[in-house]
Amino acid sequence: MAFRMKLVVCIVLLSTLAVMSSADVYKGGGGGRYGGGRYGGGGGYGGGLGGGGLGGGGLGGGKGLGGGGLGGGGLGGGGLGGGGLGGGKGLGGGGLGGGGLGGGGLGGGGLGGGKGLGGGGLGGGGLGGGRGGGYGGGGGYGGGYGGGYGGGKYKG
């Protein structure tokens, strides 16, 4: 009797796994409540190819805390610590093309920079933004127009 019960439980578990794999994993979907998935899918709070969710990401990013991957995603765009090629918006954005909180994000930047707290990178930015320039340029605290290699004007 105990053996039959174990056999039934095993069959149920295997069939459940098979359904989950066909429905989620191979369609790029979930894989857990707070993230996962074979193709970068979120799960729980996101899902799909390039999903999202808490700790999501993958190709195309998606939305949710901790997004990212190619094309950004996350909380408003880049997510907490997001970024990737194309950046996006949200705390900690960045990557190629900038993004982040208002542009560069907290510590953001990347090629093309942008505006926001701690911007910079190639094309600069900075706290309050402005238009950055050069390698690590930027307007400094409050903006202005940056230029040269790390140069730029400082406007308090």
Curated annotation (Swiss-Prot):
Keywords: Amidation, Antibiotic, Antimicrobial, Fungicide, Immunity, Innate immunity, Secreted, Signal
Organism per entry: Acanthoscurria gomesiana
Tissue: Expressed in hemocytes and secreted into the plasma following bacterial immune challenge.
Gene (UniProt): acantho1
Gene Ontology CC annotation, any one: extracellular region
Sites of Lysine amide modification: K155
Similarity comment text for this entry: Belongs to the glycine-rich peptide family.
GO biological process terms, semicolon-separated: antibacterial humoral response; antifungal humoral response; innate immune response; killing of cells of another organism
Keyword NADP attributed: no
Highest taxon listed in the record's lineage: Eukaryota
Full protein name: Acanthoscurrin-1
Major localisation: secreted
Annotated localization: Secreted
Signal peptide: 1-23
Function: Antimicrobial protein. Strong activity against the Gram-negative bacterium E.coli SBS363 and yeast C.albicans. No detectable activity against the Gram-positive bacterium M.luteus.
